Structures are given as C-alpha cells and as structure tokens.
Amino acid sequence: MRLFYAVFLPEEVRAALVEAQTKVRPFRGWKPVPPHQLHLTLLFLGERPEEELPDYLALGHRLARLEAPFRARLRGTGYFPNEGTPRVWFAKAEAEGFLRLAEGLRAGVEELLGEEAVRIPGWDKPFKPHITLARRKAPAPRVPPVLFGLEWPVEGFALVRSELKPKGPVYTVLEKFSLRGEHGREQAQGPGERPEGD
C-alpha cells in the first residue's frame, strides 16, 4: 500500500488555493490538483507492506500526543524546480510545527525501518512545507506569482493511502491524529501533576 502522512486544509484556505488555480486553468499543459485532494505532505512512505500499517498508526498517535496545535501561514506560490522547466506549481506554507511533525515522523520511521528507510523515494530530499496546486503534463508557461498572507490553525494530521488510477490518485484517510501536546503540558505543570480534564 502506498502511504503518506499529511495535513489537510480548512475550507477558507482551500478556497483561496482553488481561486489561485484559475491562473493555470487556461493552459492545458497544467493539471490542477482537485480541491478535495489539496494537502501538505509531512512524510511520504511509498509502497509499504500492509503488515507495517499498525506501526505507522502507532507512530502517528504517539507523535500527536507530544505535539501541540499550532498556527500556520500560507505565503505565495513557487515552482519545483525553481530554475529551468517547472514540473510542479505550489503554495508555500510556514510553521515550526510542520518541521517538528516532519522531523518526528522521519525519526520514528527510521527507528522502525533502520537502513531500509533510505530506500523510500525522496528520503534524501530536505523537507519544504508546501501544497501542490498543479502539475505540468505538457508544455505550458509559468504564471505570475500569487500572494496569500493567510493563517490557519493546524490541529491534526492524517495517515493517507494513495491508489494510483488512470484518472489520477485516489486518497483514503486511514486515520486522523489530533494534536494534544501532552508532553509540553506535562513539562509546564511539573512532575506528578496531571493535565486538567484527563
């Protein structure tokens, strides 16, 4: 099964991204990502045996207990690669929380898989939080940058299965993980104290 961890977006952010996609719709070479599939990938796992699924679910729950909700910012658009012929048009996202989640997931997967983790496609690439807006399928021009300046609360992430179909990938959310930040609360309360409401 083809798996990845991702953050999905609230309606107001998704609406702004869909509006930005109108910039590339006149050009048939660009294929916009369907609105319901817009997301920020935290870690791509590639094709994994189904028997490993419980480990990835447990990792998500463990990290969600440690990390607190945070606010993220949507900046402007960019291209991968930045020079030469672009393949991907994306929106840049910013938040230390994205980096913490990505690093925590990566460390957990390394612990689970050991040296095998380096065989995951893209494992050696640095994490750059972004939301893919469109992919270039044929010759098409670059479009002027779009600036957003939006903020939104990130309260969780998900483990997602991706099935590749002739018309494009189909995503299925296998599990959602709500950020609870228990580790940070325990540190603030001191030893022996229990969080309120637990």
Swiss-Prot record:
Residue numbers covered by motif HXTX 1: 39-42
Active site: 39, 130
Gene3D superfamilies linked to this entry: Cyclic phosphodiesterase
Pfam families named among the record's database cross-references: LigT_PEase
Keywords attached to this entry: Hydrolase
Source species, domain of life: Bacteria
Protein name stated in the entry: RNA 2',3'-cyclic phosphodiesterase
